[in-house]
Amino acid sequence: MSSASSEPGNGDASQQPLLGLDTVIQRLEDTILSPTASREDRALTVRGEGRQASPTPVPTRIREIVAGSLSEEPPQAGVQEPTATVARVQEENELLQEELTRLGDLLAQASAERDELASRCRVVSEQLQARLETTEAQLRRSELEHSVDLEEALGRLEAAEERSTGLCQVNALLREQLEHMKKANDALGRELAGMTGSVQRLQGELELRRWAQRQTRSGGLGQPRDLLLLWRQAVVLGTDLAELRVATERGLADLQADTARTARRLHTACLNLDSNLRLSASSTASTLGQQLRDKAGEMLQLQGRWDAEKVALQARLSEQTLLVEKLTEQNEQKAKTIAALRTDLQNLVAQEDARCLELAGSSITELGEPRRPLRSPQRATSPHQGASPPHICSPATLDPALQAMRAAIERRWRREQELCLQLKSSQALVASLQEQLSESRRELWAAQKLQQERAREQAREREALRGQLEAQRLEVQQCRASCKLLGREKAALEMVVEELKGKADAADAEKQGLEAEAAELQRSLLLQAERREELALRRERSCRALETSQGRLQQLEEKVSGLREELASVREALSTAQLQRDVVESEREGLRSALARAECSNADLELLVRRLKSEGVEQRDSLAAMAALMEGLAQDKSALNHLALQLEQERDQLREQRKTLEQERARAGEQLAQAEQQLALERAERRGLQQACGRLEQRQEQLEGQAALLGREKAQLQEQVGQVTCQKQALEEQLAQSLQDQEAQMGTLQQALQGKDALSEERAQLLAKQEALERQGRLAAEEAADLRVERDSLESSLLEAQQLATKLQEQLEEEARSAGLARQALQVEMEQLQSDWEVQEMKLRQDTVRLQRQVAQQEREAQRALESQALAHREALAQLQREKETLSLTLAEEKEVARCQLEQEKELVTKSAAEREALKGEIQSLKQERDESLLQLEHKMQQALSLKETERSLLSEELSRARRTLERVQQEAQSQQEQAQATISATTEELKALQAQFEDAITAHQRETTALRESLQDLAAERGDVEREAERLRAQLTVAQEGLAALRQELQGVEESREGLHREAQEARRALSDEAREKDVLLLFNSELRATICRAEQEKASFKRSKEEKEQKLLILEEAQAALQQEASALRAHLWELEQAGGDARQELRELHRQVRTLKAENQRRSGEAHELQAQCSQEVLELRRQAAKAEAKHEGARKEVLGLQRKLAEVEAAGEAHGQRLQEHLRESRGAEQTLRAELHSVTRKLQEASGVADALQARLDQACHRIHSLEQELAQAEGARQDAEAQLGRLCSTLRRGLGLQRQSPWASPEQPGSPTKGSDSSQALPGQQGTSPPARPHSPLRWPSPTPGGRSSELMDVATVQDILRDFVQKLREAQRERDDSRIQMATLSSRLSEAECRCARAQSRVGQLQKALAEAEEGQRRVEGALSSARAARALQKEALRRLELEHLASVRAAGQEKRRLQEQLETLRQALEESRRHSQGLAKQGKLLEEQLTNLEHRCQKAEVSLEPLRQMEQETLKREEDVARLGAEKEQLDQSLNSLHQEVDGALRQNQQLQAQMTEMEQAHTQRLQDLTAQHQRDLATEAERLHGARPQATQALESQEWTHQQQVKVLEEQVASLKEQLDQEVQWRQQAHLGQAFQTGHAQRD
């Protein structure tokens, strides 16, 4: 039983260990490899027992260990001894320890390799970090140095700009002072011209007074006192003029000396600056060329080195990137092996634990404790429990073997934990190394990118600097060539100037001869004037008319000469403008060619820049080399920037010098041309004077024959005037265009004052001589202008008093405008300086921004270079992983190569630093020289400025004195004008009575006069739009003439006002004489100032003065252009007026003929007086004429071209101006009539207002009368009541009387009653006070008190009868008074109604008059249309004449254009000379040949002009046609007579209206005295209404007539309503009176019946 039972037990036991073995093996594999281990983990190999055992996989090794342990055991394990098991366990433990040691060795090897990789990575990262830090430090240093250099450059630029701005300000101040002086001179010239005109007018007035005094002496009414006063005034004026002349000459001499000193100082300063600039430019150009050559060599050497270093560094970087990649791969593999080993260890530990547990269990079972169950194998094999082995069994129950086993397991477990910790730390190290590698790669990549970008930017900058230096070299060469050309041109100009000197000497001789001839001519003219005065006293009115026409012809001839001179000046301006335009075009072409060359060079430079950029991108890959090169390049860049700035400044200076030289050459050519033209003009003027003298002698004999031919040639002259105006317009347009071109050129010329070379002294001498010639020409022109002004002054008349006042105001306004313009010019220049400073600041800011951008771009390029280097470094790390063994050798070699390169770069840096220091020293020396020169210049300029300021202060003092005198003159003129206005207001107050009958007519005239006033204001305000305003004035004149024709019959009474106007004119003459004295003083002062200015101008020999004289010429041309425009507009206006006068105003001109004759007589008297004054002033004029003769001798040759056309234009314009003067006289007369009409208008408007006030007063009176009627009616009602009461009382009295009589005579039986019942008495006594209270006005008239009915006797009754009689008498008186008042009120109503009817009649007449005026306006508009048709036909005829003149002008223009084309061709040749620098000799010869050709062409042109003069001689016969204008004058006289008749009739009507108004005023005063208290409110209200209506009428004048008509209609309606009310009131009064009478009769009848009963 026991055996049987034991066998199954054994079988179960044997099966259980087999199953447990498989599970234990599986669990060991799971614990070592983990259940989810991959195939690769399970394929891990482990060496078997012994050193030479082959590696086997971990699962197989586990099975081998388990199989070996099982094979060593005997088949009966139950009986084995514990010692054998312990030995096996120890062996297995030893095997496991060996495996653990082997794994530890592997781990140590892996950790060693990992440490080695980590150390290598650290070394590489440290190297990269060191390189990055070095590159960053180098970049920072380069940036700091660059910023420092930029700051230094900016500081130098600012200093240079400040100096340049200082010089510019000095130059601007000098220019401003010169411009102010010029403006002051011009203003003084204008004032002198105005003063001379006023002096001449005053001389004419003095001559008229002398003639009048002579007549009065001949008639026995001489006034010696007036003559003595006049002579004393003339002597005072002469002394004042002499003093003013001396003072002005003295002041101008001082000013001239000061200006000459300043000019010399400026000239020397400019010369010093020019020499310094030239020296600095030459030295800097040479040094820059050498530096550029050195830099080019260094750059080529550096480029080669950079190429070699780039290749080596690229190879190293690729190797290092490979090494890095290999290391990363190895690290990954090692991490994998470590993870596999870790799993193996875990599996082995688990297997050992399981085996130990099984052995412990088996040993325990063998020791005889089978009942004690084992712990579940799951708990033993769980890894969590494996971490806590002491919990398996208590230590008390285990034997020492088990304890040893447990200790071994614990040791393995601890070792395993240590290994796990080491693995974790190694993985963390690997991750950190990978992150460091990635960061180092990124940093390397960024550093490579930055270095590449910086290298590219530096290459670009280097190329740009090279291009700039090359461009500057070219510009320097061009400037040198231009200087050479200018020197040659200067020599040619000197030759031309010498020739001109000879011509000028000849012209001076001719001028002296002409002066003598002019003096003789003046003497002959004076003798002729005296003869004319004698003949004027003897001849009749026809001879006087002929003399006036002769004077006008002389004036026309003078104007023709003035126009000729103006045309010549205009042509000179045109020629100068063409020359300047050609010069500008040549300069533009040169600039275009230079720009084309610059563009080509820029294209080449761009190609070079691109190539160098591509090379530079390749040259910047090494970090160490880049650091040193960056330093060198930054320093080189700063040095090159400084050099570039200096070269740019020098280039600008050279350009400015070239421009100034070219402009001076052009100006010299222009001045030569102008001098030639002036010579020709002077010759032509001399010939013109000779011919004028001949014509004067001929005209004196042919005046009567020419008077008949003037009318025929009128139309031809008008057409010719139209053609002349067209030509003038064309010339004006050309002038405007030339002026614009000249202004544009002046802007460029103003910038040329900074650079002057050594040629300026000689050129200044030549210019001084030319300026002397030009001044002589200008003096001659001014003297001729003065002569013209003196001749034109004979045209002044009595009606020019207001014009003189307005002229004075205009002169003052012009002075204020000139001062305002000067202020504006100063403000503009200040603004320009500010704008220039702002532009410079903007440029500096842009430069700084550009530099910042460049720095940023360099930084970006450096970052890109670093990034590219980082990429390359990654590749190098990958290569390092592949080539681990050769890395140390290559690194050593590379270090050696890098050291060599660094040493070489350091040597280069030292060399470049030495060169840079040398360049800096040179630059500093140059800067010091330049600063010293600039300081000297600034000092000199400050001295010149101080002198100029003193001069300016003196001038300002003189100007202030002149202004004070002008203000004093203006105040006196204003006071005189106020006196004249007071006299005029006194006369106008006498004419205020004209308002009653001419309301509508004067409103129409008021509209016309307001339109004229507005047009005149527009003329004064808008001088540029003269033609349209002239047309408007013509239309208004036609309207005024038509209005005068319509009012011809009504204006017969104007003769009386005319006498008043004559008195006012005499007073105005006196005021004008006073003003003339003051103006003479100012004229003398201005003439002396002008003389001193001319002397000052003669001594100014600088370039600035020539420029100012050109500006003066431009101003003269502008003034001439404005004068031409004004004369053209005046001629157009005169033509229109002539056509209108020829169409519609013939009858009026016939009427005005008589007045024209009288005016002719007055003009003759004035001419006589003017000749007397002219004889006194002849001595002063002789000197001026001598100078004029000299100028004419100089201008004689040039005037041959234009003489024929000028004569023709002069004749045409003279005829037009003569007729225009006549029309101006007619205009003046019409203006005088307009003034009278305005006075009448004002008076009529006042009368209208008075009439409206009268109407309102009448209406108020009517209202008062109505109120009075109502009060009378009330009084009548009260009187009726009182009468009824009285009648009742009378009835009662009668009854009492009858009763009393009856008692005495008939009825003794009557009761002795009282006379009235007490009841009645009480009633009556009670009623009467009530009545009295209701009618207080009746109380004074009824003083009775009714007696009480006391019983009495006969005496009381008699007393009652007496009182009744008194009461009746009072009542009758009151009734009579009421009737009288009623009759008076009726009479007043009748008078008021009659006055209202008269006012209505007047309104009706005014309305009819308005209708007549409207008809007249319509007829005037029709006449205007007819005139427009006639004008269109006249324009067509004038167009034909224009074509003839145009053909002649075209021939002249063709010659001028040929000359201009030849000049242009010469300028083109000059440009070719500029471009061909090497062929200077041939070009100089060509210039000489071209000068000869020019002289030949000028001679040809003179011959052509002479031919043109011969062809234009028939046109001179046009002068004979001016005599036809006398017929127009006769017609004007007839029309004036008609106007006088109409004025007489108008005066008569005005007198009648005045008488009527006086009567009305007397009646109104009588009525107003009765009703003043009640009418005050109504009149005040009505006056306010009228004031508002008047303001509204002034605000809306076209609606004035409608408003007046509506007001009149409302007045009529009101009057009608009042009349109707009065009539109704009358009817009511009559009805009430009748009713009351009937009622009274009825009551009386009833009382009678009652008493009878």
From Swiss-Prot:
Residues 86-145, 310-351, 423-1215, 1361-1570 form a coiled coil. Keywords: Coiled coil. GO terms for cellular component: centriole; centrosome. It comes from the Eukaryota. Residues 38-50 have a biased composition (Basic and acidic residues). Transmembrane segments: none annotated. Pfam families: Rootletin. Signal peptide: none annotated. Residues 1-57, 367-396, 1302-1356 are annotated as: Disordered. Residues 1-17, 1304-1335 have a biased composition (Polar residues). InterPro entries: Rootletin-like_CC (IPR055167). Belongs to the rootletin family. This is Ciliary rootlet coiled-coil protein 2. The gene is CROCC2.
